[in-house]
């Protein structure tokens, strides 16, 4: 073996060190230590796998495995920082129970719903799936099949799945788990502006004078963004931080003012602020007159429950999203009852504190950034709350300029990029189009090369309705990808678990690990994770980021994209389309669904030579799959305010914020000079509306569906903690994160604990009409609820706390309220 002088010096240094330690090294071994490629770490960029912040990380790989990650110093989002979860990304793919081959419930050598999980080949898995799907399609039609996806799908995975369901199977029964986190934000954006997603960007953090958190614990849930707020606050003494919540948490530690309000009363607080602005002549009349219209929301709209539920039957206008035009004077009259006295009485927040908050919004010289996540969205009036905060910013003209921003923070890494922009919701198509609009269907059918009438006009079953339809045997074949809804979703015992185990139904779960959802399924498909595949995510500030595959997957695991595309080969077009459609498109006769969807001359037009050598999906299908899907998808938005850059560009940058026009990203939408779609001379142009004007929408306080009573005397709020991601599927398999927070606990006020004879660490039973869980109490932790409320995180699979949550939703967004339901707490003897 030839040795350079440099290697010789290194080898001798290693040998000398070994000799001092009393170890003898062969010369060849010393040489290997000095010069072997085995010791080299290769670094490449990728967006973080966890939240919607969109941090970029550098991934270190060695010998086909991820061995390290670090914050990307070139990334404008996180500037080299990571949160504690991000620092342990290298370990999420290597849990000891990682699934490596398909598992089918079998007895006596064949599928049996009551059988044991048995390893099978991919062919057996897909053949079994196809048999079940074909039987359901033949018997009941396309409404009998469904899919539940994810804001953690890559852009390409979500696009392929939505295309397969809506164009191939002709079923709109596809919905993402983003229904549980961002649906109210989506409807809020669409009602007020006509276009989804924030108008501002993360640059606002460096310009704002006041930050107002409406139901968001950013210190734990968006910690990297929280560092930017912290830096702004500590380096600029005039800056104020305001935190509103139903319980005390870590974000209060930085707050200049904290506001603990009674559950649901945020509606009253927001209306009070609007009233204060009007009463104190703080309305920006020039902005309001030029750029807004006023509407009244239909009220008494129910709670998205089953039609036969007594609460739903009581509603005068169940599920109505209708609005009527009103004047400013009528709007003024609608908020007038929300005086400081009334708002204080309803919320429990002191009058002087409410006035202090309102003044920050009213002061024309104070730039305000409002921020929210699940506290506002997971709310039976979440859409209204989104609108009420927009009202405040529109009344004052504090919008779409640096530091003035109502900013809906996203929970998942691609809830924006995939669930929302791609349109994997049951009612949506890409680029904010909807299935109910014939013009939108026509655009999709043209891009997808479909005959007219292919895409059904009726929205499919949303997430909560999917559970009910599985329970009732209406939905029979169901594919779950990239989420753990059996643990995360509401009312587990009442709807979901009976639906999964309904003998009429066949449930497929694609996941890297044996989650609670997987264990309730009939077939489990092992899934590739993160950089085991190529993909793209879209974060909360409209930033699209792409990454290359960097390691191979484990065992026989395959990406969700591979699974969708490969499964589509099992169907001839005659098995999924009626004769009248085939007559309009005879070129598809005898073809497979794969041929129609993915070998269509568009998706498959980029040769394999353009892909990297390590790209398992592309090498399997014989063309550059990810680029083809991305470029076809991008056709929907280009020229329509959702412009994306060419796919290859994203591999050369740390993301771009759409719309990207002539190679330039957009920081502040709707503002002339920043947004290329804003008309010249307009100042502001809310071009999502036909007249270019945003809506100020009047909506009152309405009570939650349930409240504590004599038997169930405590509020329960569920949520997350810093160390774990959602249900802990990944983070609980990282030893350091698991050891840091091994178990969920019940955070309770010391006086509530004392009244029940409880001490810190005691085990309690938390129960209500929907179930019960056992958990230990914590009276001194990071979360400190007021009397009458407890907080329990949902990451712990041993404590399925969300089984207690009522499956009531916002009737407009169909998003569940996980933040308030009545429970009782008793000590376990």
From Swiss-Prot:
GO MF term list: 4 iron, 4 sulfur cluster binding; electron transfer activity; iron ion binding; molybdenum ion binding; molybdopterin cofactor binding; nitrate reductase (cytochrome) activity
The 4Fe-4S Mo/W bis-MGD-type domain is annotated at: 41-97
Any Pfam family matching the protein:
Molybdop_Fe4S4
Which residues are recorded as binding substrate?
Answer: 794
Supply one GO CC term from the record.
periplasmic space
Q: Does the keyword RNA-binding apply?
A: no
Signal sequence extent? 1-30
Residues that span the membrane, as ranges = none
Classification via InterPro entries: Asp_de-COase-like_dom_sf, CT_Nitrate-R-NapA-like, MoPterin_dinucl-bd_dom, Mopterin_OxRdtase, Mopterin_OxRdtase_4Fe-4S_dom, MopterinOxRdtase_cofactor_BS, Periplasm_NO3_reductase_lsu, Prok_molybdopt-oxidoreductase
The molecule here is called Periplasmic nitrate reductase
Function text: Catalytic subunit of the periplasmic nitrate reductase complex NapAB. Receives electrons from NapB and catalyzes the reduction of nitrate to nitrite.
The gene designation is napA
The record, for PROSITE patterns, names: 4FE4S_MOW_BIS_MGD, MOLYBDOPTERIN_PROK_1, TAT
UniProt KW keywords:
4Fe-4S, Electron transport, Iron, Iron-sulfur, Metal-binding, Molybdenum, Nitrate assimilation, Oxidoreductase, Periplasm, Signal, Transport
* PANTHER family from the UniProt entry: PERIPLASMIC NITRATE REDUCTASE (PTHR43105:SF11), RESPIRATORY NITRATE REDUCTASE (PTHR43105)
Q: In its UniProt record, which GO terms are filed under biological process?
A: cellular respiration; Mo-molybdopterin cofactor biosynthetic process; nitrate assimilation
Q: Which CDD domains match?
A: MopB_CT_Nitrate-R-NapA-like, MopB_Nitrate-R-NapA-like
Q: How does it assemble?
A: Component of the periplasmic nitrate reductase NapAB complex composed of NapA and NapB.
Q: Which reaction does it catalyse?
A: 2 Fe(II)-[cytochrome] + nitrate + 2 H(+) = 2 Fe(III)-[cytochrome] + nitrite + H2O
- Tell me what PTMs the record reports for this protein: Predicted to be exported by the Tat system. The position of the signal peptide cleavage has not been experimentally proven.
The record's comment on protein family reads: Belongs to the prokaryotic molybdopterin-containing oxidoreductase family. NasA/NapA/NarB subfamily.
């Amino acid at each position: 073996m030839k040795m350079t002088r440099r290697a010789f010096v290194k080898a001798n240094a290693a040998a000398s060190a070994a000799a001092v330690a009393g170890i003898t090294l062969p010369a060849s071994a010393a040489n290997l230590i000095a010069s072997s490629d085995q010791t080299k770490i290769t670094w490449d960029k990728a967006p973080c796998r966890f939240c919607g912040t969109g941090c970029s990380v550098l991934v270190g790989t060695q010998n086909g495995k991820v061995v390290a990650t670090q914050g990307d110093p070139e990334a404008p989002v996180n500037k080299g920082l990571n949160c504690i979860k991000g620092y342990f990304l290298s370990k999420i793919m290597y849990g000891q129970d990682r699934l490596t081959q398909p598992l089918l419930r079998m007895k006596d050598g064949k599928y049996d719903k009551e059988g044991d999980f048995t390893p099978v080949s991919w062919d057996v898995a897909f053949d079994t799936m196809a048999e079940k799907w074909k039987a359901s399609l033949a018997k009941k039609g396309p409404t009998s099949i469904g899919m539940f996806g994810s804001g953690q799908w890559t852009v390409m995975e979500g696009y392929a799945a939505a295309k397969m369901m809506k164009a191939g199977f002709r079923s709109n029964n596809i919905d993402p788990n983003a229904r549980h986190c961002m649906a109210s934000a989506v409807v809020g954006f669409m009602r007020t502006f006509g276009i989804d997603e924030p108008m501002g960007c993360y640059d606002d953090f460096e310009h704002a004078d006041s930050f107002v958190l409406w139901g968001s614990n950013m210190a734990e849930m968006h910690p990297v963004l929280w560092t930017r707020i912290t830096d702004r606050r500590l380096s600029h003494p005039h800056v104020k931080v305001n935190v509103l919540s139903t319980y005390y948490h870590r974000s209060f530690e930085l707050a200049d003012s904290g506001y603990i309000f009674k559950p649901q009363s945020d509606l009253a607080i927001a209306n009070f602020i609007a009233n204060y602005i009007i009463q104190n002549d703080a309305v920006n009349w020039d902005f309001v007159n030029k750029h807004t219209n006023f509407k009244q929301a239909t009220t008494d709209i129910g709670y998205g429950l089953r039609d036969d539920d007594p609460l739903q039957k009581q509603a005068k206008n169940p599920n109505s999203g209708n609005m009527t035009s009103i004047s400013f004077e009528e709007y003024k009259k609608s908020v007038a009852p929300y005086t400081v006295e009334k708002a204080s009485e309803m919320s429990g927040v002191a009058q002087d504190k409410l006035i202090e908050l309102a003044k920050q919004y009213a002061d024309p010289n104070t730039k305000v950034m409002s921020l929210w996540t699940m506290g506002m969205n997971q709310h039976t009036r979440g859409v209204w709350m989104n609108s009420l905060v927009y009202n405040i910013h529109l009344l004052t003209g504090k919008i779409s300029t640096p530091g003035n921003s109502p900013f809906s923070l996203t929970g998942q890494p691609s809830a924006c990029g995939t669930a929302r922009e791609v349109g994997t919701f049951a009612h949506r198509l890409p680029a904010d189009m909807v299935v109910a609009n014939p013009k939108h269907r026509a655009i999709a059918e043209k891009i997808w090369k479909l005959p007219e009438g292919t895409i059904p006009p009726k929205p499919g079953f949303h997430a909560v309705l999917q559970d009910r339809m599985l329970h009732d045997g209406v939905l029979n074949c169901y594919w779950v990808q990239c989420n753990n809804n059996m643990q995360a979703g509401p009312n587990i015992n009442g709807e979901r678990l009976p639906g999964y185990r309904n003998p009429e139904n066949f449930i497929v779960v694609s996941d890297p690990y044996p989650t609670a959802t997987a264990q309730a399924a009939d077939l489990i498909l092992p899934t590739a994770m993160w950089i085991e595949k190529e993909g793209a995510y879209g974060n909360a500030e409209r930033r699209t980021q792409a990454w290359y595959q960097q390691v191979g997957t484990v065992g026989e695991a395959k990406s969700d994209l591979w699974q969708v595309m490969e499964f589509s080969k099992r169907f001839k077009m005659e098995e999924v389309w009626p004769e009248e459609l085939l007559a309009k498109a005879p070129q598809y006769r005898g073809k497979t669904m794969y041929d129609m969807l993915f070998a269509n001359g568009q998706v498959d037009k980029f040769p394999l030579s353009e892909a990297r050598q390590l790209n398992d999906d592309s090498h399997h299908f014989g063309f550059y799959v990810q680029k083809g899907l991305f470029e076809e998808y991008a056709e929907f938005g280009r020229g329509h305010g959702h412009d994306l850059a060419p796919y290859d560009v994203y591999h050369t940058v740390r993301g771009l914020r759409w719309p990207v026009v002539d190679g330039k990203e957009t920081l502040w939408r709707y503002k002339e000079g920043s947004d290329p779609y804003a008309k010249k001379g307009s100042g502001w142009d809310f071009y999502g509306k036909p007249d270019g004007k945003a809506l100020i929408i009047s909506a009152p306080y309405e009570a939650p569906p349930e409240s504590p009573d004599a038997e169930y005397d405590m509020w329960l709020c569920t949520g997350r903690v810093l160390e774990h991601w959602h249900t802990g599927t990944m983070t609980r398999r990282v030893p350091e994160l698991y050891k840091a927070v091994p178990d969920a606990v019940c955070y309770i006020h010391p006086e509530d604990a004392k009244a029940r004879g409880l001490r810190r660490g005691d085990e309690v039973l938390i129960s209500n009409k929907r179930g019960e869980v056992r958990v230990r109490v914590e009276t001194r932790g990071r979360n400190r609820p007021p009397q009458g409320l407890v907080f329990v995180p949902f990451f712990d699979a041993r404590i399925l706390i969300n089984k207690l949550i009522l499956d009531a939703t916002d009737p407009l967004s169909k998003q569940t309220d996980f933040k308030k339901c009545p429970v009782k707490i008793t000590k376990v003897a």
